[in-house]
């Protein structure tokens, strides 16, 4: 028995010293002995055991199928030879000399596995041979999914490449960008391609960078989805989901008279998407009907985040040259740069009124005229209604007449008392007095939509509820429906 222990010890020393472990693939190689017995000399105690070439073998398998070690017992005699080498053996012991490697069968990977792992659309069409390639070598399943690994995997599928998308029609053009209707080869779905020209001296416009940085982190049923980003030397292309029209075109197609039930659904979705943005500390800052996209189902989505920005603290100073004039609040018109989420709520009130009446509430062409329209309906502010207003130099300069506030119901007769109350709470002079998006969507005006609509996950459409349906418009025009049966896409404002 002492001699056997000596043999085992020497064999172990030989295995450790005979060949190092290759770590080139990130994991140790599996080492085993060949089927043949160890052919040592007659006196194993005098010399180290010699292993014939080929007896040590390394097995390197793919990461996805780590080999399983199977020990097969060999009978060895007291002279150190196996029964294969010597037919006579007086004392038999079992020793795990022979090691055979057994590979697990490759993992079967499905399209659903890839979609879930990489957060891809369910209708994605993977390139030919991609599944077979992953079956042989599947790093996205065998390693933690780092940002770099995810980027490489998406590129292999076709994301980030211009050739993945087919341009169909030119929808509009701005100072820096052109928007095209397009089609994705990956999903066969329509997309909107916002192609931003890169000036060599200036690089990408800050509005484009801002839009990308914010949208890639905003995941909500009422916010337009950014599908892809393609960066070349000459352009930056943003690939958005395609929606049929914007709210301005919807109003035009309805003869400026939207069914009041649909007004309620659109307003709720606007508030729902905006409340999510504000929870993420993002201000849109450019709300207007042209930036609210609507599809055939009636889903409304916030778009064009070119002027949006992340809000760090409520008192941060921002530019007052934001928000299209008609939807700009009076405190911003008078030069205030001290604002937070309330800047968006004034615009919501203006859009609510426009949906209910079919006309803009304050259609001024200059800042002075815009303020005049506001004060003529809501009343000229005083120290009682707007503390500190008389110390505002711009306000004193304009020297507006002393208007008395008018009842909003007289201007929007289709609103009920709850609707008028909500509109009043949105159209407050001081931002701090305006109702928040979160509180506004819980207003009694929306009671008829039921309780379940408030419990939906962020990424679920309100139309997932069977009790929520868009009603047919009485005056809808069919001119916006092309021969394909899909309504025309209204281009998002591309001016930067």
From Swiss-Prot:
Keyword check for Phosphoprotein: yes
Impact after mutating residue 36 to A/D: Does not affect interaction with CCNYl1
Domain of life: Eukaryota
Coiled-coil parts of chain: none
Biological-process GO terms, alphabetical: exocytosis; growth hormone secretion; neuron projection development; positive regulation of autophagy; regulation of insulin secretion involved in cellular response to glucose stimulus; spermatogenesis
Gene3D superfamilies: Phosphorylase Kinase, domain 1 (3.30.200.20), Transferase(Phosphotransferase) domain 1 (1.10.510.10)
Knocked-out gene: effects: No visible phenotype in females; they are viable and fertile. Male mice are infertile, due to a defect in late stages of spermatogenesis.
Keywords: ATP-binding, Cell membrane, Cytoplasm, Cytoplasmic vesicle, Differentiation, Kinase, Membrane, Nucleotide-binding, Phosphoprotein, Serine/threonine-protein kinase, Spermatogenesis, Synapse, Synaptosome, Transferase
Membrane topology, record value: Peripheral membrane protein
Residues with PTM Phosphothreonine: 175, 380
Variant or mutagenesis effect after changing residue 175 to A: Reduces interaction with CCNYL1
Subunit structure: Found in a complex containing CABLES1, CDK17 and TDRD7. Interacts with BRSK2. Identified in a complex with NSF, syntaxin-1, synaptotagmin, SYN1, SYP and CDK5R1. Interacts with YWHAH, YWHAQ and YWHAZ. Interacts with CCNY; this interaction increases the CDK16 kinase activity. Interacts with CCNYL1; this interaction mutually increases the stability of CDK16 and CCNYL1 and increases the kinase activity of CDK16. Interacts with NSF.
Task performed by this protein: Protein kinase that plays a role in vesicle-mediated transport processes and exocytosis. Can phosphorylate CCNY at 'Ser-336' (in vitro). Plays a role in the regulation of insulin secretion in response to changes in blood glucose levels. Regulates GH1 release by brain neurons. Phosphorylates NSF, and thereby regulates NSF oligomerization. Required for normal spermatogenesis. Regulates neuron differentiation and dendrite development.
Database matches in PANTHER family: CELL DIVISION PROTEIN KINASE, CYCLIN-DEPENDENT KINASE 16
Protein name: Cyclin-dependent kinase 16
Organism, as annotated: Mus musculus (Mouse)
């Amino acid at each position: 028995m002492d001699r056997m222990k000596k043999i085992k010890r020497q064999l172990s020393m030989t295995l450790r010293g005979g060949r190092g472990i290759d770590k080139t693939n990130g994991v140790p190689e599996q080492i085993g002995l060949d089927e043949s017995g160890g052919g040592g000399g007659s006196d194993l105690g005098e010399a180290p055991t010699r292993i014939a070439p080929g007896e040590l073998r390394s097995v390197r398998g793919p990461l996805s199928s780590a080999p399983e070690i199977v020990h097969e017992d060999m009978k060895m005699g007291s002279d150190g030879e196996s029964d294969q080498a010597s037919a006579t053996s007086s004392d038999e012991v079992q020793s795990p000399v022979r090691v055979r490697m057994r590979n697990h069968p490759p993992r079967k990977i499905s399209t659903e596995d890839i979609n879930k792992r990489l957060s891809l659309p369910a209708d994605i069409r993977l390139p030919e041979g991609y599944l077979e390639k992953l079956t042989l070598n599947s790093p996205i399943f065998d390693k933690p999914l780092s940002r770099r690994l995810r980027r490489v995997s998406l590129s292999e599928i076709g994301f980030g490449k211009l050739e993945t998308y087919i341009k169909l029609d030119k929808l509009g053009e701005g100072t820096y960008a052109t928007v095209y209707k397009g089609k994705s080869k990956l999903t066969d779905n329509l997309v909107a391609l916002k192609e931003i020209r890169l000036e060599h001296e200036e690089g990408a416009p800050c509005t484009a960078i801002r839009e990308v940085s914010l949208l890639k982190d905003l995941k909500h049923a009422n916010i337009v989805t950014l599908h892809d980003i393609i960066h070349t030397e000459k352009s930056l292309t943003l690939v958005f989901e395609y929606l049929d029209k914007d709210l301005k075109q919807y109003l035009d197609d309805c003869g400026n008279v939207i069914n009041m039930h649909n007004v309620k659904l659109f307003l709720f979705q606007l508030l729902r998407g905006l409340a999510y943005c504000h929870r993420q500390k993002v201000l849109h800052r450019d709300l207007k009907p042209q930036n609210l996209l609507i599809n055939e189902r009636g889903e409304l989505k916030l778009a064009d985040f070119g002027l949006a920005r992340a809000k760090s603290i409520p008192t941060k100073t921002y530019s007052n040259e934001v928000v299209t004039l008609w939807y700009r609040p009076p405190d911003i018109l008078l030069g205030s740069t001290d604002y937070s989420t309330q800047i968006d709520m004034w615009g919501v009130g203006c859009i609510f009124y426009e949906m209910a009446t079919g006309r803009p509430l304050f259609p001024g062409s200059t800042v002075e005229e815009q303020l005049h329209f506001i004060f003529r309906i809501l009343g000229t502010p005083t120290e009682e209604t707007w503390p500190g207003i008389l110390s505002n130099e711009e306000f004193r300069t304009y020297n507006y007449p002393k208007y008395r506030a008018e009842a909003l119901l007289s201007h929007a007769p289709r609103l009920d008392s709850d609707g008028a109350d909500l509109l009043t709470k949105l159209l407050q002079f001081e931002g701090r007095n305006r109702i928040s998006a979160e509180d506004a969507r819980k207003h009694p005006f929306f009671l008829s939509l039921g309780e379940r609509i408030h419990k939906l996950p962020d990424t679920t459409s309100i139309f997932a509820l069977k009790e929520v349906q868009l009603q047919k418009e009485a005056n809808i025009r069919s001119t916006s429906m092309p021969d394909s049966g899909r309504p025309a896409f209204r281009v998002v404002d591309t001016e930067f």
